[in-house]
Amino acid sequence: MELTRPLGDISSSATVTIESTEESASISHEESENVLHLQPEPVRRVRWTVSTVDNEHMNKKKSKVCCIFHKQRKFDESSSDSDSDSDSDSSCSSCCSRNAYERA
């Protein structure tokens, strides 16, 4: 930081330059420097309850309800209006008429 000012009245041409030391500036800078300490979020883990059913060892052949996707229709749209989906609906076996517990 430099300060420059003329000495005496306007007719004189001498100037004095005052330089401040950087040590005092750096000390005040270190004091005003804030440090933020961040804590990591706790690790989220899946926890199973006692009432959780194990589907892997229940001798089920498959866990999917049905392998064919049925497109949702609007309320006023009939099922006979579908274009090419009607062919795929006929290939669905009787597995879709029963729920997953009845098929097991």
Curated annotation (Swiss-Prot):
One of its GO terms (cellular component) is cytosol. One of its GO terms (biological process) is mitotic spindle assembly checkpoint signaling. Residues 10-27 have a biased composition (Low complexity). The keyword Nucleus applies. It is found in: Nucleus. Residues 78-88 have a biased composition (Acidic residues). Its main location: nucleus. Residues 1-41, 74-104 are annotated as: Disordered. It comes from the Eukaryota. GO terms for molecular function: protein phosphatase 1 binding; protein serine/threonine phosphatase inhibitor activity. Keywords: Nucleus. Regulator of type 1 phosphatases which maintains protein phosphatase activity under strict control. Belongs to the YPI1 family. This is Type 1 phosphatases regulator ypi1.
